[in-house]
Amino acid sequence: MKSTFLVVLELAFFLLPGRVLYAQKDSEDGGSHYSSDDCQVTPVIHVLQYPGCVPKPIPSFACIGRCASYIQVSGSKIWQMERSCMCCQESGEREASVSLFCPKAKNGEKKFRKVSTKAPLECMCRPCTGIEDANVIPQELTSFADEGTLTGYFQKSHYKSIE
């Protein structure tokens, strides 16, 4: 059971104007802990598909994690609410070209089709905005290391500046 002082202190913390970076949560054992941003590049398997070609799973990366978001009463206008919505997003890209086998290719057409794909280079918490749907969808998490298997597929592309 929380003391009245702690409840008042927590309430005052959330009503202060400005950005809340950490939110306190009660754990099952009765203690408290603070959650913070946890957004990182994570190895995944992407399945590349093209009509008439055999889908091909490849090792790739995705931005996975959580970022601090909140809504609170405005410090200057108590009848208004302040919102901060942060999302785990890419801050740079990797590019790769992969060949897909296309057994249904017509005579004169190539049996292999080169498909380009992208993956995040780095991830960070940024304001949530609409992001274009990617052509590839993470299918499952993998245990690939950052070196070795994955580095053969991807090369550094360009860096997107967020300002």
Swiss-Prot record:
Subcellular location: Secreted
Source species, domain of life: Eukaryota
InterPro entries found in the cross-reference section: Cys_knot_C (IPR006207), Cystine-knot_cytokine (IPR029034), DAN (IPR004133)
MF annotations from Gene Ontology: hormone activity; receptor ligand activity
Disulphide bridges, residue numbers: 39-88, 53-102, 63-123, 67-125, 85-128
Keyword NAD annotated: no
Positions of the CTCK domain: 39-129
Pfam families: DAN
CC per GO annotation: extracellular space
Signal sequence, renumbered to the chain: 1-23
Entry function: Final heterodimeric neurohormone released at the end of the molting cycle, involved in the sclerotization (tanning) of the insect cuticle, melanization and wing spreading.
Protein name as catalogued: Bursicon
Origin species: Anopheles gambiae
Name of the coding gene: burs124
